[in-house]
């Protein structure tokens, strides 16, 4: 399925990398069974895509994943689905997946945004504003709410050079990316831990995640 949408002013390709659901968000294990945790991860992806899809700057959405359920959910939004070629045991699987997606779409897009797929409180306007701010720089990023991680990495006319992983905010800053300083609380609230999920719920989470965590 093609992830390219019509729109004369849309000039950005969005990439979301999603790992296999069974291996994702293990730090949520203390509050969820394995099956529920997988459902939470999938629901957060759906809510992220629900917020991102209406952003007028986006010409395409590409989801790279080895997971069939995640791929099927993303396809419902018209996303281009790429099978993650990263082998098991790879030392840097997230950045490798992002680089593979960048290579796949770089021939069509010189402007690319990488977005985390675990942003259940994301608002469409936040992502629109962040992309507008990113246009003033060749390469920029949005830190997470704790200031240590990265919620989004944006490039306009240059390579992504993704540095996701531990202390990715500092890594992106050291690599020359400009930190974007807008408030955007939902964009900054990625969910890795029960505390992150509580913070997202205080902001207001999307319908898919709400259905899964309603019993908490």
Curated annotation (Swiss-Prot):
Which organism's genome codes for this protein? Mycobacterium leprae (strain TN)
Q: What is its EC number?
A: 2.7.7.105
- What protein am I looking at? Phosphoenolpyruvate guanylyltransferase
Catalysed reactions, as listed in the record: phosphoenolpyruvate + GTP + H(+) = enolpyruvoyl-2-diphospho-5'-guanosine + diphosphate
Q: Which residues form a coiled coil?
A: none
Q: What does this protein do?
A: Guanylyltransferase that catalyzes the activation of phosphoenolpyruvate (PEP) as enolpyruvoyl-2-diphospho-5'-guanosine, via the condensation of PEP with GTP. It is involved in the biosynthesis of coenzyme F420, a hydride carrier cofactor.
Family of this protein: Belongs to the CofC family.
Biological pathway: Cofactor biosynthesis; coenzyme F420 biosynthesis
């Amino acid at each position: 399925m093609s992830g390219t949408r019509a729109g004369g002013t849309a000039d950005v390709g969005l990439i979301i990398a999603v790992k296999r659901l069974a291996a994702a968000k293990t730090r949520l294990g203390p509050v969820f069974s394995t099956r529920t945790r997988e459902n939470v991860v999938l629901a957060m992806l759906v809510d992220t895509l629900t917020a991102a899809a209406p952003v007028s700057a986006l010409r395409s959405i590409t989801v790279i994943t080895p997971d069939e359920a995640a791929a099927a959910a993303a396809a419902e939004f018209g996303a281009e689905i790429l099978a993650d070629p990263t082998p098991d045991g790879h030392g840097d699987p997230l950045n490798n997946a992002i680089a593979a997606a960048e290579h796949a779409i770089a021939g069509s897009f010189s402007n690319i945004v990488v977005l985390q797929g675990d942003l259940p409180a994301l608002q469409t306007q936040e992502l629109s504003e962040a992309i507008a701010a990113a246009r003033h720089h060749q390469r920029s990023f949005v830190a997470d709410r704790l200031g240590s991680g990265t919620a989004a990495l944006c490039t306009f006319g240059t390579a992504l050079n993704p540095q996701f992983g531990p202390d990715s905010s500092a890594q992106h800053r050291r690599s020359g990316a400009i930190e974007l300083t807008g408030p955007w609380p939902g964009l900054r609230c990625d969910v890795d831990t029960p505390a992150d999920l509580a913070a997202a719920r205080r902001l207001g989470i999307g319908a898919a995640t709400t259905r899964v965590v309603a019993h908490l």
